[in-house]
Amino acid sequence: MSYSVGQVAGFAGVTVRTLHHYDDIGLLVPSERSHAGHRRYSDADLDRLQQILFYRELGFPLDEVAALLDDPAADPRAHLRRQHELLSARIGKLQKMAAAVEQAMEARSMGINLTPEEKFEVFGDFDPDQYEEEVRERWGNTDAYRQSKEKTASYTKEDWQRIQDEADELTRRFVALMDAGEPADSEGAMDAAEDHRQGIARNHYDCGYEMHTCLGEMYVSDERFTRNIDAAKPGLAAYMRDAILANAVRHTP
C-alpha cells in the first residue's frame, strides 16, 4: 500500500513542504511515483520518517540524521534502542527542570530581588534566575505571580531582610515545637502554620488554605526545598507540611 504526500503529512503532523524538502535533500525519497509524477510513500518510507522525526525531536540536525539512518552497520532495532536511551535521558532532564521551575516560582513569590550572592545565601545552591524564562512562561499568567511582582517591585533590601527575619523566627518556632514533642496538629504548630500563611499573604500574594497546602506539599516533594528547610532540623519540612495541612483543615468548614 502506498500513501500520498498529503496523507503522510497528516499522519506525521508535518507539512507537505517539509516532506518535499526531505525528498529534495535525499533524506526521505518516496519509493514510488504515480503516473502523473506525484510522490507515493510506502510503509517502509513511513518507518524511516518516524525515525527522522524521533531524531529531530531530540535535536539532531538533518545531516546527522541522514548519516545515522544511512549507516549500514545500524539496524532499525539499534536506532530504537538509541532513541529510547536518549528520550529517557531527556525525560529525566525535563523532570528536573520542571522541579526547578516550581522552586523558581516559589523563590520569585518570596520576592528574591537581591544580588546573586544574597540569593544563594537565602536559598543555598539554587539560583532562581537560572529558570527565569521558564518561570514567566509557566506562571506568568497566574494571579499569584502578578501580585507578587507588583507588591515586591518597590521593596528595598531592608524589606527583604525583614521578611527573612520573619521567616527565620518562624523556623525557630517550628523547631522549638518539634524539640518539645508537640505534634504537627497541635495548637502551637497550627498557629505557626497560620502565621506562615499570613506572612505570604502580607508580603507577596493572596494565599488561601488550598494554595498554602500546595506549598506545603512542595516542601517535601522537591528535594531542594526539603534540603533547605531540613538544614534547620531534620524532618522539619514534613513537620511544616503536616502543620500546614492541619491548619487548613481547622479553618475549613
From Swiss-Prot:
Subunit details: Homodimer.
CDD domains found in the cross-reference section: HTH_TipAL-Mta (cd01106)
Name of this protein: HTH-type transcriptional activator TipA
Pfam family, one: MerR_1
Gene name of the record: tipA
GO molecular function, one term: DNA-binding transcription factor activity
Record keywords: Activator, DNA-binding, Transcription, Transcription regulation
Residues of the HTH merR-type domain: 1-71
Parts of the chain that traverse the membrane: none
